[in-house]
Amino acid sequence: MTVILATIKWIAVVLGAMIALFILGLVLVPPLTRSFTDSWGATEQETATTFPGDDIIPAPRENSTKAITIDAPPQIVYALIQQMGQHRAGWYGWDWFYNATGSSDFVDGHYSTRIVPELQAVKVGDRININDAVAYTVIEANTDQALVMLAGSLTAQQIGEPSQPETWSANTMAWILRPTSAGGTRLILRMRADGTETGFARWMWNGPFNFGGALFSRKTMDGIKRTAEALAQ
């Protein structure tokens, strides 16, 4: 009996320590890494540049710029980006997470390592699902150059207008493609957000959710790079 109680106590201590470390991580890691994750891979010039979609949320509470160089032409990279989404070609990241959270049902059963012909005609007004409850609306689709999407409780026309409700949220995801001199692509992801969240909700969005989103965004960019470069061979 003493051995059993000692074992239970040991398990409780270990679990308590793990929970404490997790909470400590939620509090400390996001602010300590924010300056890095908000500009992951981007140059100072890229972070300071105005890109398509910036005018939708002109004075954002959240603003980040991530970038990666891909040894594949913009045509291939854009094709992969415009086919992303739930019930589409996936997110080029951790499929197990999207399966677990109901954000998958991808056309190939996992993120597609091919260009899917039937998903190559994205246009303004199209909705790209994150999951069954949340979707982005395409605001700008400039083939091989930029794909800008908006999510939240507002339309692009409502932001800053008298019709804007008292409680709202909005965030943009802009994929910017720039050809490189070597025939590749400089892929830039500009994300901006604003809203009326306060207190704990704002802390969660500014801290843990922002940090987690940075990790998933980078994983997606790495997946796009890997897939595009394989297709370019």
Question: What would you call each of these model-derived segments?
Answer:
Residues 38-40, 80, 173-175:
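Tryptophan-centered motif/residue detector
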